[in-house]
């Protein structure tokens, strides 16, 4: 997606219009192009810590090096997913929203101890190449919102960055949640993490149990309309569930999402606050990232407070940029299942 539009997608200091517009631009590319590995075109990985190592990513790019990478620098969401799958000491650096203004870890960091990692960039457009070089990286890992566009790697310096180490990139929009999770499991395994370790298998069991609970909740309490949305001071954004891996997965389990009728760029419909009630719903699944306004921030907006689902207290946090691991997704599914189970029809 063009950088003129993309920076706002992730930068905390700008409006949510730009934040989501970047995603919309990404959606067009994702929906128009089938890229890289999928269920019918699986990744390949080979090698050990001492011999030749290779891995094929979602660009259908095969990385081949002399030994297993043991110094990995990754986008924060990618690093968090790899950590959940057992990659630990090999992670030496991260980029993307890692720390909040308070100095605490951003929720995107998951189980990572961010104080033990070198942060080469914390905001959109920030990537310290000199600091990256001092890490002596063997591999860079990130996502792609659009085919062949590396998430949080500035295009202005991408060539220099990629000269320092090979890269692996995974598609993170317009794909199924299980397949996106599996890609990170494949890479973690290729990096030497045991995918049969109890921490991994237990997380998978929890994910499966949570998924079953969500299906049971939608069956037991049918007809609950869920509005997946994000908010800023000027607009309310209604998400198209079909391009979000987590939302489309939840839909397959029976969640009834409100479908916006005027989707811009493939990701969302933006509404003025005066029209925030355009789509009646029973539950709001609200973007919980640091860049988005939260219920406490929205309390002073009459149009927000007037929504029936808000009056009923039926607002659930949504980490709209999923962490592609079983451990990262299971708690979100559990929370949504519980919310739907207890929700009441208000529209």
Protein language model regions, located:
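Structured C-terminal subdomain patch of bacterial secreted/periplasmic proteins
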Residues: 163, 179-180, 275-347
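Extracytoplasmic low-complexity, Pro/Thr/Ser/Ala/Gly-rich segments
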Residues: 43-88, 97-100, 340-347
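N-terminal secretory signal peptides
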Residues: 1-14, 23-33
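A short, structured surface patch at a secondary-structure boundary
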Residues: 75-131, 135, 145-150
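Bacterial lipoprotein signal-peptidase II cleavage site
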Residues: 35-45
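Extracytoplasmic substrate-binding proteins
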Residues: 159-232, 322, 326-347
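Extracytoplasmic ligand-binding site segments that recognize negatively charged/polar headgroups
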Residues: 98-103, 146-156, 169-187, 223-247, ...
């Amino acid at each position: 997606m063009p950088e003129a539009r993309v920076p706002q997608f992730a930068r905390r200091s700008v409006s949510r219009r730009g934040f989501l517009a970047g995603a919309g631009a990404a959606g067009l590319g994702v929906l128009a192009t089938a890229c890289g590995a999928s269920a019918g075109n699986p990744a390949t990985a080979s090698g050990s810590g001492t011999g030749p190592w290779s891995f094929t990513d979602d660009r259908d790019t095969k990385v081949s090096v002399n030994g297993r990478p043991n110094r990995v620098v990754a986008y924060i969401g990618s690093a968090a997913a790899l950590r959940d799958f057992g990659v630990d000491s090999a992670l030496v650096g991260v980029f993307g929203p890692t720390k909040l203004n308070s100095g605490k870890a951003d929720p995107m960091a998951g189980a990572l101890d961010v104080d033990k990692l070198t942060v080469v960039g914390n905001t959109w457009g920030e990537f310290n190449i000199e600091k990256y070089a001092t890490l002596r990286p063997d591999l860079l890992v990130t996502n792609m919102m659009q085919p062949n566009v590396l998430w949080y790697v500035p295009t202005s310096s991408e060539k220099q960055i990629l000269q320092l180490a090979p890269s692996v990139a995974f598609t993170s929009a317009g794909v199924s949640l299980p397949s996106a999770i599996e890609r990170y499991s494949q890479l973690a395994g290729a990096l030497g993490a045991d995918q049969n370790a109890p921490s991994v298998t237990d997380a998978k069991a929890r994910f499966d149990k949570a998924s079953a609970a969500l299906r049971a909740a939608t069956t037991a309490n049918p007809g609950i309309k869920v509005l997946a949305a994000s908010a800023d001071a000027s607009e309310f954004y209604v998400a198209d569930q079909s391009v979000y891996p987590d939302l489309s997965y939840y839909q397959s389990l029976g969640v009834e999402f409100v479908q916006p009728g005027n989707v811009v760029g493939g990701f969302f419909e933006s509404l003025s606050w005066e029209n925030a009630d355009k789509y009646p719903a029973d539950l709001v699944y609200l973007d919980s990232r640091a860049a988005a306004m939260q219920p406490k921030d929205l309390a002073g907006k009459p149009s927000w407070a007037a929504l029936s689902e808000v009056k009923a207290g039926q607002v659930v946090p949504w980490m709209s940029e999923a962490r592609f691991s079983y451990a990262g997704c299971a708690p979100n599914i559990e929370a949504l299942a519980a919310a739907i189970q207890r929700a009441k029809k208000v529209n």
